[in-house]
Amino acid sequence: MTDVPVSRIRNFCIIAHIDHGKSTLADRMLQMTETVAQRKMKEQFLDNMDLERERGITIKLQAARMNYRSKDGEDYVLNLIDTPGHVDFSYEVSRSLAACEGALLVVDSSQGVEAQTLANVYLALENNLEIIPILNKIDLPGSEPERVANEIEEVVGLDCTGIIKASAKAGIGVDEILESIVHLVPPPSDTVDKPLRALIFDSYYDPYRGVIVYFRVMDGTVKTGDRVRLMASGKEYEIDELGVLSPNQIEVESLHAGEVGYFAAAIKAVEDARVGDTITLAEAPAKEPLPGYTEAKPMVFCGLFPTDADQYEDLREALNRLKLNDAALSYEPETSSAMGFGFRCGFLGLLHMEIVQERLEREYDLDLITTAPSVIYRVTTIDGEVIQVDNPSLLPSPQEREKVEEPYIEVEMITPETYVGTLMELCQSRRGVFKDMRYFTLSRTSLVYELPLAEVVTDFFDQLKSRSRGYASMEYQLIGYRENPLVKLDILVNGDSVDALAMIVHRDKAYYVGRALTEKLKELIPRHQFKVPIQAAIGSKVIASEHIPALRKDVLAKCYGGDISRKKKLLQKQAKGKKRMKAIGTVDVPQEAFMAVLKLDPQ
C-alpha cells in the first residue's frame, strides 16, 4: 500500500433504489479493478449478512478501496462507500454521503426514478457532491433508456446528454463508469497539515477486537499508536490497528486527509463510537467537530416477548449483542399480564423493526411474539408537565391529561398515474392531509401527503404496494407534533383487559377499529366450555362487543322419553357448572390474535 497523493484519490458512493442494481455494479467494479480475486468473487460481495442477500437490500454499510490504472496511464485510488437505500437508514446515508465527493446515481432503465432515490439525491446535493447519472439494466427487453433519461432530467434536474448506459450484470459500460469517476469526481481537499479530524461513517462489533470503526480522514494524519478522542462522547482510545478496506482489511501504518480506512482500539460497544462522530487526536485536538452529527432516535416501538418464558434471558442476551452492532436500537424490560416478561424495543422505522425481529429469530433461534407497533406520543398533563408515552398502557386517564399530540410525517409517493386515485383514497382513510401533486412524465406522478406516523407504522407500506401492484414507492420525513383527539382503546376478553392488545386511536376511528378487532378476535380465539365475551372499550364505556358461543355437551343424550323434570334437572346442573367455570376459567388468547392487530383494515 504505497502513499497516494491526495490529487489521485476519489471518494464516491452509489445511490440507487432497492433492486436497481447497486450491489451488482459494486461487484463488477471490484472485479474490473482486480480488487477481489476472480475465485473469491461471489454475488453481492459487499452485502455480508445473509438477510441482506435474501432480501436484496443493503443494511450495514460496507466500504472498498480499489486501485485503478486510468486510460491516461495514472494510478488512482477509488474508495467506494456503500450506502443503504432504505428510508429507515437515511441518517447512515447522510453520513456516508458526507464522506464522499461524488455519487453515482444508478437508475433501472426499465423502472425509472423512485421516491427513495430522490430523497438520497437531495441529500447528495445538500452535501455538494458531483452526481454522475447511470442507466442500468439496458440489456433488459423492457428497458426504455430515452424515457428514463428524460425523467432524470425532469425530476432530478441533472443534465443527461452524455448519460452512461450500462448493464452491471453483463459488465457493459463499467469501464466508462470507472473513467468518469476519475475525471468527473473532484479529489478531496488537501488539508494534511491541519489538526486531525475524521468522520465515522460506520462501525461494527467484532467479538475478538471490540468495535471496528470505519472512517474517512477529513484533515490531518492518523497513525497506529495514536491516542484519539471521539468528540461527541469525549472518550479517548489508543489505536491498536489501523488499515484500509480492500474490501478485506489490510493493515497500514498511517492514513492522511482524503483516505478512507478502519481502526480498532478496544472499544466495548458501538454506542461509544457513534456514526457521524468526529475523531481527533487527544494531544492536539481540533477546535470544532465536523458538522451534521445527531443521535439516531427511535421512532417506532413495539413489545417483544418470547413464546416460551424460559427464553427471556436468551432474548436479553441476543438484544445485548444486536445492540453492540446497532446503536439505533433501544430496549428496556417490560411485563405484560397477557404475555409475561419481555422487552419494549425502539426502532428507526418499520423495515428496521422487521430486520431486528428476523435477526433475533434467525441468528439466535428465538420464538417471539410482537405487539402492535406504536409511536411516541407527547402528553401534557393537568399540572402542565409534558411526558413521552410509547406504550398505550401508560397513557394517563382523560381526567389526568390536558392534551395528546402525535408525530406527523410528510410522505412523498411516486406512482404511475393509473394508481393516483386509489393511493389518495388510502391516504384519506389514514387521516392524511393532501399537500401537493406533480406530474413528472406521463407515467410518473408525485403525491405529497401529511400523515400521522401512527397510521403509517402498521401496514401502510404493504397497502401502498398492493394498491399500486408494486409500482409505487414512498419516502417520508418527520415534520413535528400535532394535537388530536386521541383515546386509549382497551380490549377485554372475558371481562379482563388484555394489555398487549391496547392501542391509542383517533376518537372518530375508535368504533371502526374496535368493531374490526373484536370480529377478528372472535374468529381467532378458540371456543371454550363457556361463553366468552370480547369487548372493545374506551375507559368504562364499551363501544363494540362480540361473543364466542360455548361448546355444548349434549347432557340429554341418555334420556329416552321420560319425565321433563329429569331433563330440566340435568340442564340446570350443566348451567351451574358452566357458571362456575366462567367465574374461574381462563381464556387462552392464541399468538395469531396479537398479530391480528397488525393486519386490521377498519373500513
From Swiss-Prot:
Residues 7-189 form the tr-type G domain. It holds the Pfam family GTP_EFTU_D2. It is a peripheral membrane protein. GTP binds at residues 19-24, 136-139. Its EC number is 3.6.5.n1. One of its GO terms (molecular function) is ribosome binding. It is an enzyme of class 3 (hydrolase). It is found in: Cell inner membrane. GO terms for biological process: positive regulation of translation; translation. Keywords: Cell inner membrane, Cell membrane, GTP-binding, Hydrolase, Membrane, Nucleotide-binding, Protein biosynthesis. Coiled coil: none annotated. Belongs to the TRAFAC class translation factor GTPase superfamily. Classic translation factor GTPase family. LepA subfamily. This is Elongation factor 4. The lineage of its organism: Bacteria, Bacillati, Cyanobacteriota, Cyanophyceae, Oscillatoriophycideae.
